[in-house]
A protein has these predicted regions:
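Conserved BB-loop
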Residues: 24-36
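Short hydrophobic/aromatic segments of transmembrane alpha-helices and their interfaces
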Residues: 25, 42-43
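Acidic, PIN/NYN-like endoribonuclease modules and their adjacent C-terminal/linker elements
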Residues: 1-8, 12, 17-20, 33, ...
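Short, surface-exposed connector motifs at secondary-structure boundaries
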Residues: 23-24, 48
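Acidic, metal-binding active-site segment of PIN/NYN-like and related structure-specific nucleases
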Residues: 38, 46-64
Length: 122
């Protein structure tokens, strides 16, 4: 199962819900990683071998592409984008289930996060 790194805008409660489902997830929010710039976060994700989970931010795609071009030997394992800008507490369990399924698809080789995977909560 792939390891996940939840971007600073995602609640540590989501990481906890994922861990309860057997998905290795750590949250940037509330940790020393919260002070990192995006480029530093990409480097940390690459070093830790973790897929970044973040909101669907158009700038993020350009930034991670630039990081990959500038660091050909230090690639981020991938990105999972979730829709919206905020997750309500009542949505955490459902979102964790969807992300767990995406992680299982990655694990089975059915999805490739290197180019970004977009989660559908519909």
């Amino acid at each position: 199962m792939p390891k996940l790194l939840l971007d600073e805008h995602l609640s540590p409660n989501l990481a906890e819900a994922l861990m309860k489902r057997g998905v290795d997830a750590i949250a940037v929010a509330g940790s020393p990683l919260a002070t990192l710039l995006d480029e530093e976060l990409f480097a940390k994700a690459a070093d830790l071998g973790r897929i970044i989970v973040t909101f669907n931010n158009p700038d993020f795609v350009a930034e991670i592409t630039a990081f990959a071009a500038a660091n050909p030997n230090r690639q981020v394992p991938g990105v999972i984008f979730i829709p919206g800008k905020k997750i309500r507490a009542s949505e955490i369990s459902r979102l964790a289930a969807v992300i767990e399924e995406v992680a299982r698809r990655i694990d089975r080789g059915e999805a490739d996060p290197r180019y970004g995977l977009w989660v559908d909560l519909g």
